[in-house]
């Protein structure tokens, strides 16, 4: 076996924290007078920054918007972040770790923040389903490959 294959991957969570949080109920108290049948929209975004060698900040942005009759009942935004040490992997494996594995670690914390905020706004309980960040990351890679192929085709023409 080569030395590279013997090198072990190291993954450590240094810290998990809420970076930013926002809750708005722009149509309260009128929204409380209506029968609660909202349309709930979930938006997710991730980003990562290098803080030091093998040390990364990963930010998971979760936005939940509940609308009723085309009016916003509530808008909840959470930026859940973590500082992670990742050693022994590079390239696509590192991108997968930062773009899928770390968000999987962060999501339960973001979900708990959102549930608490919605409850404090006195809205009915909101249960966010688990998210498959691995599948989202694979979709992202496929889109990048398609864009790269389209861009290389344009350049050759």
From Swiss-Prot:
Q: Major place of localization?
A: cytoplasm
BP GO terms, sorted: protein folding; protein tetramerization; protein transport
Q: Has keyword Ribosomal protein?
A: no
Which cellular component, as a GO term, is one annotated location?
Answer: cytoplasm
Q: Cite the CDD domains for this sequence.
A: Translocase_SecB
**InterPro entries associated with the record:** SecB, SecB-like_sf
List the keywords (alphabetical).
Chaperone, Cytoplasm, Protein transport, Translocation, Transport
Subcellular location per UniProt equals: Cytoplasm
SUPFAM superfamilies listed in its UniProt record: SecB-like
Keyword field contains Repeat? no
What molecular function terms (GO) are annotated for this protein? unfolded protein binding
Under the subunit heading, UniProt states:
Homotetramer, a dimer of dimers. One homotetramer interacts with 1 SecA dimer.
Function per UniProt: One of the proteins required for the normal export of preproteins out of the cell cytoplasm. It is a molecular chaperone that binds to a subset of precursor proteins, maintaining them in a translocation-competent state. It also specifically binds to its receptor SecA.
PANTHER family assigned: PROTEIN-EXPORT PROTEIN SECB (PTHR36918:SF1), PTHR36918
Family membership, please give it.
Belongs to the SecB family.
Report the protein name in the record. Answer: Protein-export protein SecB
Q: Which organism is it from?
A: Proteus mirabilis (strain HI4320)
- Lineage of the organism: Bacteria, Pseudomonadati, Pseudomonadota, Gammaproteobacteria, Enterobacterales
């Amino acid at each position: 076996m080569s030395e590279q294959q013997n090198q072990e991957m190291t993954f450590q969570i240094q810290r998990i924290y809420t970076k930013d949080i926002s809750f708005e109920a722009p149509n309260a108290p009128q929204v409380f007078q209506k029968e609660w049948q909202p349309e709930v929209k979930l938006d997710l975004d991730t980003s990562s920054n290098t803080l030091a060698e093998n040390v990364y900040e990963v930010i998971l942005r979760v936005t939940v918007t509940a609308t009723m009759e085309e009016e916003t009942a509530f808008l909840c935004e959470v930026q859940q972040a973590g500082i992670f040490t990742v050693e022994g992997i590079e390239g696509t494996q590192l991108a997968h770790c930062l773009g899928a594995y770390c968000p999987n670690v962060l999501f339960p914390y973001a979900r708990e923040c959102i549930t608490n905020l919605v409850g404090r706004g006195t809205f009915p309980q909101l249960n966010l389903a688990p998210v498959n960040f691995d599948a989202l990351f694979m979709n992202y890679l496929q889109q990048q490959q398609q864009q790269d192929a389209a861009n290389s085709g344009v350049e050759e023409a």
